[in-house]
Amino acid sequence: MIDLSFLTEEEQDAILKVLQRDAALKRAEEERVRHLPEKIKDDQQLKNMSGQWFYEAKAKRHRDKIHGADIIRASMRRKKLPAAAEQNKDTAMRAKESWVNNVNKDAVLPPEIAVVEEPEDDTDPAGPSSSLVDPASSVIDMSQESTRTPAVSLPKQRKNPFNSPKLPEDHSLQQTKPEQSKTGKAGLFQISKEGELSESKEKSSIPDMPRQQLEKPKQTVSTEPENASHTKAPIPKARKLIYKSNDLEKDDNQSFPRQRRDSLNARGAPRGILKRNSSSSSTDSETLRLNYNLDPKSKILSPGLTIHERISEKEFSLEDDSSTSSLEPLKHVRFSAVKNELPQSPRPVLGQEVGEFTVLESDQLQNGTEDAGDIEEFQNHPELSHKTPLSHYQLVSSPSDSGREREQLMSSGSAPRDEIPCHSDILPTGPQCVESSSVINGQQEKSSHFTKLPSELSKSPSDELTQCGEPEPSQTADHSFRDHRQGSEEEHSPVLKTLERRAARKLPSKSLEDIPSDSSNQAKVDNLPEELVRSAEDDQKADQEPDTNECIPGISTVPSLPDNQFSHPDKLKRMSKSVPAFLQDESDDRETDTASESSYQLRRYKKSPSSLTNLSSSSGMTSLSSASGSVMSVYSGDFGNLEVKGSVQFALDYVESLKELHVFVAQCKDLAAADVKKQRSDPYVKTYLLPDKGKMGKKKTLVVKKTLNPVYNEILRYKIERQFLKTQKLNLSVWHRDTFKRNSFLGEVELDLETWDWDSKQNKQLKWYPLKRKTAPVALETENRGEMKLALQYVPEPSPGKKLPTTGEVHIWVKECLDLPLLRGSHLNSFVKCTILPDTSRKSRQKTRAVGKTTNPVFNHTMVYDGFRPEDLMEACVELTVWDHYKLTNQFLGGLRIGFGTGKSYGTEVDWMDSTSEEVALWEKMVNSPNTWVEATLPLRMLLIAKLSK
């Protein structure tokens, strides 16, 4: 609020003229925008010319800002409040400050029109002396004064005649009756008295009021024909989807249609005193700057225009049930099982700005001038405070509805879903219900200072918030009503907080290779189920446990053992099934290769000039038995050591009206068990539109915990034109979510959309598809990946003076690479990694330094591996891979596998023994020429399971 008390009359008139010109310009602009769809057919051009883009950007950047004109209007109206009335406010007065005092007005105008067409008057309608005059005449004078002001321009502060200190309550009531007969304005006085009596029936002022006195004014109101225009309650129009913003300007003094007015006059009296909570966003209490989502074809506003309303919890009438029928058509109920984010008040919602009365109301809240009449009404009628559960639906109603109508419609929440129109962007439910009722709860908290609520009322806000929870998963048949909830719904999930704390915690000096990255985007996309929330504490405990598999920093040469380190076929077979890390794109957007190769930046391997050796194959072989899925290499043609089995049930449909591809994922059955001991997995489904995975993005379902037969019933949506689908393939894969390690592949299904019949009803039905193993990409194998210039040497006896029998060493001299491919435009920062298969332990890996800004990097780096006997050379394979390092991710460029290429290692079939003829020739030459450097330039190739670059 702004203090405008210093303004003179001339200055106020000048400001009002500016506001009037602003309102006229707004009306002209709205008229122009309303006719735009008739001339412009292009959606993007219509969005630009209508100014929709501006309001969207403004809502994002200035969410907490209020329109300047509204602040000025509210400040000028605030100035009109009588100073004496503010000083004499007490608890009983606050119970009567309500919209009910304005029900005898004959017009309902928006605030900006009221300011423009009705000049303000500085005279105080109820001065300090009003409390000393006769109560009846003072009320009549105030009613006459209020008819000369705009209908809802300001909730005037009136002196309650029943609280006059010089007149007893019952005496004042006896005096008012003869005054009615003397004046010709009994209707006005009776309306005012009826509003005050039926609103609260206060115990402090009229404790023993007979019920006949409450009913008598209702009968006399209908007998005054000359005041018929004053007896109509200002019922605002019920909002519909088809809404024109200039209706209010066209109907300046008509607050509702003539048919509605006639029906009210036919009954003789308005339907009781329609109590309106000031927190309800009705058409007469705020300026709506509508977001025009216009459909050029239908020329109507799209469902995105739906106005979010804050629901008043306490709009109840004291009339009988027979009076509810005339207002039944005015009720518009919309249900939605979808969550959208609702900005907290007073933030604008998609172009809707906070009106001037919202500013006034917030100012009254701060000054403690809150209406307490609603709560006292609950005290006198505790049966009205009963709330029927929402039954998984959220209710939206016009602010003029009675409480009994609301109870009837809320109790009908269990109606069949096929009779309820569902919109995906109407009203939020779930946690956002707390925000939508923030004004109501604040009102109850402030009013509790004056009045102690009964148990029913104190219990109702929490009960209603509890009922606002998200709906239960629907059955398979009604999947069209389900919407895939993505975004930041689970921002308050304890698991997400746990992961954020772990990600923010300072890491020790150990390598990033040893730490599986757990802070993933999946937790921000998946709506975590109850099981994952319940297991949050377990995750925290497990996170606090020390990592027993942590590798010891530093490099040392371990003497080799004379046993046959490679003679364990069962271990070898298990290692050949490990997950290829750099292809494992299921690491929750951790686009890394073998367990995040960015650890080379930490210089974990402190190599000294005197010792180029790393841990030998002997030490590597001892760790074979403890190898897990997180120890990965490039060699594996499989995507995990889990058996692929089971099937998935889903259906495809293309919605022309939305231009969206819908993938309805129903359920899976008989999946592989990631937890073999407990025979369970934590599966979820992920989809891609190939070949361009990055453009359309991946979509995921929720993670269903601890089951092999998950039920999802979710719709994954892709915004894509139908003609583009002919060039796409749908890849649907099932994965096991592991909290602390990489996710495991459970199977996939791939459908070619080029030949898909979208008009066939059979294709829209749910079908079971068997899960298959992941296929290796062969399209990139023939690409030119560059070349590597290197030299190999086998040293059979590096230290002949020792007593124990020694083993040989293999020296690998990586000289340079030529013509490496550019995957990031003109940027390249390459390095080489070496592993001797079948040893895949982290301790046995060695890397070169990274050389940037060139496609022909010179490394000149020698790697030494010991522990080799002559027979081991027949079973081993040197794997050299080239990577492009960028920040925390590495992209695979190409690689070599130098060995004999027999397809077997120690009698076990392995997929990494696939050397080309050139690679085999180099390895044979090295074995046959010990203690001699054998040099060659070999072409890099895309290994069998290498990841497609994005």
From Swiss-Prot:
Residues 87-97, 193-205, 246-264, 479-502, 531-544 have a biased composition (Basic and acidic residues). Highly expressed in brain, lung, kidney, testis and in embryos after day 7. Detected at lower levels in skeletal muscle. Expressed in pancreatic alpha cells. Isoform 6 is highly expressed in brain, but not detectable in the other tissues tested. Isoform 1 is expressed abundantly in the stomach and is predominantly localized at the apical region of gastric-surface mucus cells. Isoform 11 is expressed in cytotoxic T-lymphocytes (CTL). The keyword Repeat applies. Residues 608-620 have a biased composition (Low complexity). Isoform 1 is highly susceptible to proteolytic degradation and is stabilized by the interaction with RAB27A. Residues 1-57 form the RabBD domain. InterPro entries: C2_dom, C2_domain_sf, FYVE_2, Rab_BD, SYTL1-5_C2B. Residues 140-150, 173-183, 219-230, 434-445, 557-567 have a biased composition (Polar residues). The RabBD domain mediates interaction with RAB27A. The C2 1 domain mediates localization to the cell membrane. One of its GO terms (molecular function) is neurexin family protein binding. This is Synaptotagmin-like protein 2. Monomer. Binds NRXN1. Binds RAB27A that has been activated by GTP-binding. Interacts with RAB27B. Isoform 11 acts as a RAB27A effector protein and plays a role in cytotoxic granule exocytosis in lymphocytes. Required for cytotoxic granule docking at the immunologic synapse. Isoform 1 may play a role in melanosome transport and vesicle trafficking. It controls melanosome distribution in the cell periphery and regulates melanocyte morphology. Isoform 1 acts as a positive mediator of mucus secretion by the surface mucus cells of the stomach. Changing residue 699 to Q: Loss of membrane localization. Keywords: Cell membrane, Exocytosis, Membrane, Repeat. One of its GO terms (biological process) is intracellular protein transport. CDD domains: C2A_SLP-1_2 (cd08393), C2B_SLP_1-2-3-4 (cd04020). GO terms for cellular component: melanosome; melanosome membrane; membrane; plasma membrane. Residues 78-98, 116-289, 361-620 are annotated as: Disordered. Gene3D superfamilies: 6.10.250.3000, C2 domain. Residues 644-769, 784-913 form the C2 domain. The lineage of its organism: Eukaryota, Metazoa, Chordata, Craniata, Vertebrata. Disruption phenotype: Mice show a reduced number of mucus granules, a deficiency of granule docking with the apical plasma membrane in the gastric-surface mucus cells and reduction of mucus secretion by gastric primary cells.
